[in-house]
């Protein structure tokens, strides 16, 4: 009797896929810190990292050495258990969310029928990590930063979910692969769901706390916000987690609005991973370009923009989409 039954083999393959995907995401997140500094230097007419290795290519190695060997100090006035748990929860929630992203027709960690709901569950979990970090630090700037972050995240996640309901109404499924295949047979959702794309992208920038929505970390006001007391690997987990969030939102934009692994007009379908990676890289560069070109607004302007502009626009988009779907549905087929 062998242990390698078909079920065991399937489980081993699933574990290997999960490890490969998660390691690739972590490595890409670490590399993005170097890529961002080089691109910002290029766009701002300066050099950027150029001291460690040829063209500064080994800067990431220097950053990692510093992160690994810097003292992992915990303030004596902090709640040590929650203080340590916060960065672990933050990074774990982002990594687990990648489980529902279909990279190619055959590569993906999990094919869940509730893929979109699973993503929002993990996105909501990351809010607790930020609150844990701010409260457990026992620092007024950290607490204010965490309160800003949680309020901003909750505000933008409201219409972030509604922005995708138009897609769900058209496809009739929360499954990511079903959404990709629907786009392969019809138009990419960037065309019929353009306003949903705009609001989801704005919400994605806000949820990842990226410029211009980096209010929770505003250096001029909050001295780096909720991770002011963190150092060493704990700070590194927050730092790399921010770039992992960028990759996650970019991959979701590609999957939900730009046909996933399909190329334009289904050109070269055998290059599924290439198309997915190329489109994801484009949105990652767009995240970085926003940081280089747009000033940071006031916090009240950020919140007003969410509730007074984005939410009504998302509701209108959902109502119009639902009306069109109902009008195009044959009589008697609506259940």
From Swiss-Prot:
Listed PROSITE patterns: COMPLEX1_ND1_1, COMPLEX1_ND1_2
Subcellular location: Cell inner membrane
Keywords, ordered alphabetically: Cell inner membrane, Cell membrane, Membrane, NAD, Quinone, Translocase, Transmembrane, Transmembrane helix, Ubiquinone
Residues annotated as transmembrane: 12-32, 81-101, 114-134, 154-174, 187-207, 238-258, 270-290, 307-327
EC class of the enzyme, as a word: translocase
Enzyme Commission number(s): 7.1.1.-
Listed GO CC annotations: plasma membrane
Pfam families in the cross-refs: NADHdh
Membrane topology: Multi-pass membrane protein
InterPro entries: NADH_UbQ_OxRdtase_su1/FPO, NADH_UbQ_OxRdtase_su1_CS
Top-rank taxon: Bacteria
GO molecular function: NADH dehydrogenase activity; oxidoreductase activity, acting on NAD(P)H, quinone or similar compound as acceptor; quinone binding
Reaction catalyzed: a quinone + NADH + 5 H(+)(in) = a quinol + NAD(+) + 4 H(+)(out)
GO BP annotation list: aerobic respiration
Complexes and interactors: NDH-1 is composed of 13 different subunits. Subunits NuoA, H, J, K, L, M, N constitute the membrane sector of the complex.
Function: NDH-1 shuttles electrons from NADH, via FMN and iron-sulfur (Fe-S) centers, to quinones in the respiratory chain. The immediate electron acceptor for the enzyme in this species is believed to be ubiquinone. Couples the redox reaction to proton translocation (for every two electrons transferred, four hydrogen ions are translocated across the cytoplasmic membrane), and thus conserves the redox energy in a proton gradient. This subunit may bind ubiquinone.
Similarity section: Belongs to the complex I subunit 1 family.
Protein name: NADH-quinone oxidoreductase subunit H
Species for this entry: Pseudomonas syringae pv. tomato (strain ATCC BAA-871 / DC3000)
């Amino acid at each position: 009797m062998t242990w390698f039954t078909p079920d065991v083999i399937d489980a081993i393959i699933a574990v290997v896929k999960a490890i490969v995907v998660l390691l690739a995401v972590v490595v890409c997140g670490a590399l993005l810190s170097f890529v961002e500094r080089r691109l910002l230097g290029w766009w701002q007419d300066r050099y950027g990292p150029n001291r460690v290795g040829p063209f500064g290519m080994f800067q990431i190695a220097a950053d990692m050495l510093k992160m690994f060997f810097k003292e992992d100090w915990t303030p004596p006035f902090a709640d040590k258990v929650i203080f340590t748990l916060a960065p672990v929860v933050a990074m774990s929630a982002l990594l687990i969310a990648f489980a529902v992203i279909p990279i190619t027709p055959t590569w993906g960690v999990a094919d869940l029928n509730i893929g979109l709901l699973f993503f929002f569950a993990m996105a909501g979990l990351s809010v607790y990590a930020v609150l844990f970090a701010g409260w457990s630090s026992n620092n007024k700037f950290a607490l204010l930063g965490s309160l800003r972050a949680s309020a901003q995240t909750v505000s933008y996640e409201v219409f972030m979910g509604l922005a995708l309901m138009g897609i769900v109404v058209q496809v009739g499924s929360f499954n990511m692969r079903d959404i990709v295949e629907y786009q392969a047979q019809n138009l990419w959702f960037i065309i019929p769901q353009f306003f949903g794309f705009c609001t989801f992208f704005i919400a994605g920038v806000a949820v990842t706390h990226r410029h211009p929505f980096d209010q929770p970390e505003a250096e001029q006001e909050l001295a780096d916000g909720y991770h002011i007391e963190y150092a060493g690997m704990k700070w590194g987990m927050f730092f790399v987690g921010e770039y992992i969030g960028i990759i996650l939102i970019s991959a979701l934009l590609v999957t939900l609005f730009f046909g996933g692994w399909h190329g334009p007009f289904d050109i070269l379908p055998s290059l599924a991973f290439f198309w997915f990676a190329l489109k994801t890289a484009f949105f990652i560069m767009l995240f970085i370009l926003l940081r280089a070109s747009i000033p940071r607004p006031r916090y009240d302007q950020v919140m007003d923009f969410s509730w007074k502009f984005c939410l009504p626009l998302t509701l209108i988009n959902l109502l119009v989409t639902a009306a069109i779907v109902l009008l195009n549905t044959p009589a008697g087929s609506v259940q």
